[in-house]
Amino acid sequence: NRGGVTGKRDYAGGVVGLMDLGRVSGCENYGDIASTDGGYVGGIAGASWGTIRDSWVKCHLSGGDYIGGVAGLGATLENCHTLVEIEEGSAYLGAVAGDVDADAAVSDNTFTSERLGALDGISYAGHAEPVDFDTLCTTPGVPESFSRLELTFVADGVVVEVVPFQYGEGIDALPEIPAKKGCSASWPDLDYTCLTASQTLEAEYTPYTSA
């Protein structure tokens, strides 16, 4: 999935919102996932009592509580890998899962994050653990799209430029913003010297005010 998903209430996921049983395998999600008035937000599933395995997530997540890179709430999570940013969340936040069921089976999951733990803020060696980005990108089966990092600059719905970067490094210059009559323009205020996640950035136009 490459399209963004925004839900109004609980259970927003890049592949499935709520999965009571079954299996999701070999999926990728690159679309940002959000809930405006709910929780249970996940890169693959909002909440899952089935199995999620062999999947990859690179996106931004936001919502209330239970927000996770693979699942907001999960049960069986195997060999999944994430590079996610949680932009907004109140409780139960994790790079792999916001939280897991009491009888959960979690194994061989990895992630890269400067500030998140794996499951509700805690990581577990061999089960859900952090690795550096270079290690993440040498994991067997890594998709090409997962390891490619880039900033997409957009103005008035039109892509101005796509700028690649290396994890933890910056970009040399910002692209020129197309002029709009009667407005000043700027890109979002961001630390462009140390970038760790792909994202789309919208030009901000501000009308001139007369004295």
Predicted regions and their residues:
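Beta-rich interaction/scaffold domains
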Residues: L190, Y205-A211
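Compositionally biased, intrinsically disordered/low-complexity regions enriched for serine, proline
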Residues: H127, C137-P140, E161, D172-P175, ...
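A broad, low-specificity signal marking well-ordered, structured residues that form hydrophobic/aromatic
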Residues: L151, L201, A211
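A detector of low-complexity, intrinsically disordered, Ser/Thr/Gly/Pro/Ala-rich segments
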Residues: D108, P175, S198, E204-P207
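Solvent-exposed, low-complexity, repeat-rich "mucin-like" stalks and linkers
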Residues: L151, A155-E176
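Surface-exposed interfaces of beta-sheet-rich extracellular modules
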Residues: E169-T200
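Predominantly extracellular beta-rich ligand-binding scaffolds that present long acidic/polar faces
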Residues: N1-D156, Y208
